[in-house]
Amino acid sequence: MSASLINRSLTNIRTELDFLKGSNVISNDVYDQINKSLPAKWDPANAPRNASPASLEYVEALYQFDPQQDGDLGLKPGDKVQLLEKLSPEWYKGSCNGRTGIFPANYVKPAFSGSNGPSNLPPPPQYKAQELQQIPTQNSAASSYQQQPFPPPSTNYYQQPQQQPQQAPPPQQQQQQQQHQSSHSHLKSFGSKLGNAAIFGAGASIGSDIVNNIF
Protein backbone atom coordinates (compact mmCIF):
# COMPACT_ATOMS: atom_id res chain seq x y z
CA MET A 1 0.00 0.00 0.00
CA SER A 2 1.30 3.45 -0.89
CA ALA A 3 2.43 5.86 1.80
CA SER A 4 0.21 8.65 0.43
CA LEU A 5 -2.97 6.68 1.01
CA ILE A 6 -1.91 5.80 4.56
CA ASN A 7 -1.11 9.42 5.40
CA ARG A 8 -4.43 10.53 3.93
CA SER A 9 -6.23 8.05 6.21
CA LEU A 10 -4.35 9.42 9.23
CA THR A 11 -5.49 12.92 8.33
CA ASN A 12 -9.11 11.77 8.03
CA ILE A 13 -8.92 10.08 11.43
CA ARG A 14 -7.69 13.26 13.09
CA THR A 15 -10.47 15.23 11.41
CA GLU A 16 -13.06 12.80 12.72
CA LEU A 17 -11.52 12.94 16.21
CA ASP A 18 -11.79 16.72 16.17
CA PHE A 19 -15.46 16.43 15.21
CA LEU A 20 -16.17 13.91 18.00
CA LYS A 21 -14.36 16.06 20.53
CA GLY A 22 -16.24 19.20 19.48
CA SER A 23 -19.55 17.29 19.71
CA ASN A 24 -18.71 16.20 23.27
CA VAL A 25 -18.79 12.55 22.18
CA ILE A 26 -15.29 11.87 23.52
CA SER A 27 -13.43 13.58 26.30
CA ASN A 28 -10.19 15.48 25.97
CA ASP A 29 -8.28 12.64 27.62
CA VAL A 30 -9.56 10.10 25.09
CA TYR A 31 -8.83 12.50 22.27
CA ASP A 32 -5.26 13.05 23.45
CA GLN A 33 -4.69 9.31 24.01
CA ILE A 34 -5.83 8.35 20.50
CA ASN A 35 -4.08 11.27 18.85
CA LYS A 36 -0.77 10.42 20.53
CA SER A 37 -1.09 6.78 19.40
CA LEU A 38 -1.23 7.83 15.77
CA PRO A 39 2.01 8.65 13.96
CA ALA A 40 2.35 12.17 12.60
CA LYS A 41 3.39 10.77 9.24
CA TRP A 42 3.86 7.18 8.14
CA ASP A 43 7.28 6.25 6.76
CA PRO A 44 7.80 2.69 5.43
CA ALA A 45 11.47 2.78 6.48
CA ASN A 46 10.50 3.38 10.10
CA ALA A 47 7.79 0.75 10.25
CA PRO A 48 8.14 -1.54 13.32
CA ARG A 49 9.26 -5.11 12.66
CA ASN A 50 8.15 -6.98 15.74
CA ALA A 51 8.20 -10.77 15.45
CA SER A 52 4.98 -12.24 16.71
CA PRO A 53 5.06 -15.39 18.87
CA ALA A 54 3.01 -17.19 16.25
CA SER A 55 5.90 -16.98 13.78
CA LEU A 56 8.20 -18.97 16.07
CA GLU A 57 8.44 -22.67 15.32
CA TYR A 58 9.33 -25.31 17.88
CA VAL A 59 10.17 -28.97 17.55
CA GLU A 60 10.34 -31.73 20.13
CA ALA A 61 13.18 -34.24 20.30
CA LEU A 62 12.18 -37.87 19.81
CA TYR A 63 15.59 -39.50 20.28
CA GLN A 64 18.84 -38.69 22.00
CA PHE A 65 21.48 -37.08 19.79
CA ASP A 66 25.07 -36.80 20.95
CA PRO A 67 27.10 -34.06 19.23
CA GLN A 68 29.59 -35.48 16.74
CA GLN A 69 31.52 -32.27 16.11
CA ASP A 70 31.61 -28.61 17.00
CA GLY A 71 28.39 -26.85 16.10
CA ASP A 72 26.12 -29.82 16.78
CA LEU A 73 23.25 -29.45 19.23
CA GLY A 74 22.85 -32.30 21.70
CA LEU A 75 19.31 -33.50 22.23
CA LYS A 76 17.45 -35.63 24.72
CA PRO A 77 13.96 -37.08 24.28
CA GLY A 78 11.36 -34.46 25.17
CA ASP A 79 13.60 -31.40 24.63
CA LYS A 80 11.79 -28.43 23.09
CA VAL A 81 13.94 -26.80 20.44
CA GLN A 82 13.27 -23.42 18.85
CA LEU A 83 13.75 -23.90 15.12
CA LEU A 84 15.94 -21.17 13.68
CA GLU A 85 16.67 -22.42 10.19
CA LYS A 86 16.09 -25.44 7.98
CA LEU A 87 19.49 -25.92 6.44
CA SER A 88 18.37 -28.93 4.36
CA PRO A 89 15.74 -31.66 4.48
CA GLU A 90 18.16 -33.67 6.65
CA TRP A 91 19.54 -31.02 9.05
CA TYR A 92 17.96 -28.25 11.11
CA LYS A 93 19.46 -25.44 13.16
CA GLY A 94 17.89 -24.57 16.47
CA SER A 95 18.29 -23.35 20.02
CA CYS A 96 17.64 -25.30 23.22
CA ASN A 97 18.53 -24.54 26.85
CA GLY A 98 20.70 -21.59 25.85
CA ARG A 99 22.65 -23.63 23.27
CA THR A 100 22.48 -23.24 19.51
CA GLY A 101 23.53 -25.84 17.00
CA ILE A 102 22.67 -28.27 14.24
CA PHE A 103 20.75 -31.53 14.71
CA PRO A 104 19.19 -34.23 12.47
CA ALA A 105 15.73 -33.41 11.17
CA ASN A 106 14.45 -36.96 11.61
CA TYR A 107 15.21 -36.86 15.36
CA VAL A 108 12.42 -34.34 16.07
CA LYS A 109 8.73 -33.75 15.46
CA PRO A 110 6.69 -30.51 15.38
CA ALA A 111 5.73 -29.08 18.77
CA PHE A 112 3.43 -26.22 19.85
CA SER A 113 2.23 -25.89 16.25
CA GLY A 114 -1.06 -27.75 16.52
CA SER A 115 0.31 -30.70 14.56
CA ASN A 116 1.36 -34.03 16.00
CA GLY A 117 2.46 -35.51 12.69
CA PRO A 118 5.95 -36.88 12.06
CA SER A 119 8.79 -34.79 10.70
CA ASN A 120 9.70 -34.68 7.03
CA LEU A 121 12.21 -37.50 7.43
CA PRO A 122 10.91 -39.99 9.99
CA PRO A 123 13.10 -42.83 11.26
CA PRO A 124 12.93 -46.14 9.45
CA PRO A 125 9.38 -47.48 9.68
CA GLN A 126 8.52 -50.49 11.80
CA TYR A 127 7.28 -53.31 9.65
CA LYS A 128 4.00 -54.87 10.70
CA ALA A 129 3.74 -58.50 11.62
CA GLN A 130 1.43 -59.13 8.67
CA GLU A 131 4.12 -57.86 6.27
CA LEU A 132 6.79 -60.18 7.73
CA GLN A 133 4.76 -63.30 7.16
CA GLN A 134 6.05 -65.33 4.24
CA ILE A 135 3.73 -66.17 1.43
CA PRO A 136 3.06 -69.95 1.57
CA THR A 137 4.34 -71.98 -1.36
CA GLN A 138 2.33 -74.56 -3.23
CA ASN A 139 3.86 -77.45 -1.28
CA SER A 140 3.26 -75.83 2.09
CA ALA A 141 -0.30 -75.00 1.08
CA ALA A 142 -0.90 -78.62 0.09
CA SER A 143 0.67 -79.83 3.35
CA SER A 144 -1.48 -77.53 5.44
CA TYR A 145 -4.53 -78.70 3.51
CA GLN A 146 -3.69 -82.35 4.21
CA GLN A 147 -3.16 -81.67 7.90
CA GLN A 148 -6.58 -80.17 8.38
CA PRO A 149 -8.74 -82.13 10.85
CA PHE A 150 -11.57 -84.28 9.67
CA PRO A 151 -14.97 -82.59 9.71
CA PRO A 152 -17.42 -83.55 12.47
CA PRO A 153 -19.76 -86.47 11.86
CA SER A 154 -22.72 -84.15 11.65
CA THR A 155 -21.50 -82.85 8.33
CA ASN A 156 -22.00 -86.33 6.76
CA TYR A 157 -18.91 -85.78 4.59
CA TYR A 158 -17.89 -89.44 5.02
CA GLN A 159 -21.32 -91.08 5.06
CA GLN A 160 -21.42 -94.51 3.41
CA PRO A 161 -23.35 -94.57 0.14
CA GLN A 162 -26.82 -95.97 0.43
CA GLN A 163 -27.39 -99.43 -1.04
CA GLN A 164 -29.71 -99.34 -3.95
CA PRO A 165 -32.65 -101.79 -3.61
CA GLN A 166 -32.57 -104.69 -6.01
CA GLN A 167 -35.26 -104.48 -8.54
CA ALA A 168 -37.65 -107.43 -8.78
CA PRO A 169 -37.56 -109.27 -12.11
CA PRO A 170 -40.25 -108.31 -14.55
CA PRO A 171 -43.52 -110.29 -14.38
CA GLN A 172 -42.82 -111.95 -17.74
CA GLN A 173 -39.41 -113.22 -16.61
CA GLN A 174 -40.90 -114.41 -13.29
CA GLN A 175 -43.68 -116.23 -15.15
CA GLN A 176 -41.13 -117.93 -17.40
CA GLN A 177 -39.18 -119.08 -14.37
CA GLN A 178 -42.35 -120.48 -12.77
CA GLN A 179 -43.28 -122.29 -16.01
CA HIS A 180 -39.78 -123.74 -16.28
CA GLN A 181 -39.94 -125.00 -12.68
CA SER A 182 -43.46 -126.45 -13.25
CA SER A 183 -42.42 -128.30 -16.42
CA HIS A 184 -39.35 -129.63 -14.65
CA SER A 185 -41.52 -131.03 -11.83
CA HIS A 186 -43.95 -132.58 -14.34
CA LEU A 187 -41.10 -134.31 -16.16
CA LYS A 188 -39.73 -135.59 -12.88
CA SER A 189 -43.15 -137.00 -11.90
CA PHE A 190 -43.64 -138.55 -15.32
CA GLY A 191 -40.22 -140.16 -15.18
CA SER A 192 -40.99 -141.57 -11.79
CA LYS A 193 -44.23 -143.09 -13.10
CA LEU A 194 -42.40 -144.63 -16.07
CA GLY A 195 -39.89 -146.17 -13.72
CA ASN A 196 -42.63 -147.66 -11.60
CA ALA A 197 -44.36 -149.00 -14.66
CA ALA A 198 -41.18 -150.58 -15.93
CA ILE A 199 -40.58 -152.25 -12.60
CA PHE A 200 -44.15 -153.47 -12.45
CA GLY A 201 -43.90 -154.81 -15.99
CA ALA A 202 -40.68 -156.69 -15.29
CA GLY A 203 -42.17 -158.18 -12.12
CA ALA A 204 -45.28 -159.31 -13.96
CA SER A 205 -43.20 -160.97 -16.68
CA ILE A 206 -41.11 -162.87 -14.15
CA GLY A 207 -44.23 -163.98 -12.29
CA SER A 208 -45.79 -165.34 -15.48
CA ASP A 209 -42.64 -167.33 -16.31
CA ILE A 210 -42.68 -168.94 -12.87
CA VAL A 211 -46.32 -169.92 -13.20
CA ASN A 212 -45.69 -171.47 -16.65
CA ASN A 213 -42.79 -173.52 -15.33
CA ILE A 214 -44.91 -174.95 -12.53
CA PHE A 215 -47.61 -176.10 -14.81
Swiss-Prot record:
The modification Phosphoserine is found at S52, S55. Pfam families: SH3_1. GO terms for biological process: negative regulation of Arp2/3 complex-mediated actin nucleation. SUPFAM superfamilies: SH3-domain. Residues 114-189 are annotated as: Disordered. Gene3D superfamilies: SH3 Domains. Induction: By heat shock. Can thereby reach physiological protein levels high enough to promote prion-formation. There is a cross-link at K80 (Glycyl lysine isopeptide (Lys-Gly) (interchain with G-Cter in ubiquitin)). Keywords: Acetylation, Cytoplasm, Cytoskeleton, Isopeptide bond, Nucleus, Phosphoprotein, SH3 domain, Ubl conjugation. PANTHER family: JAK PATHWAY SIGNAL TRANSDUCTION ADAPTOR MOLECULE, LAS SEVENTEEN-BINDING PROTEIN 1. This is [PSI+] inducibility protein 3. It comes from Saccharomyces cerevisiae (strain ATCC 204508 / S288c).
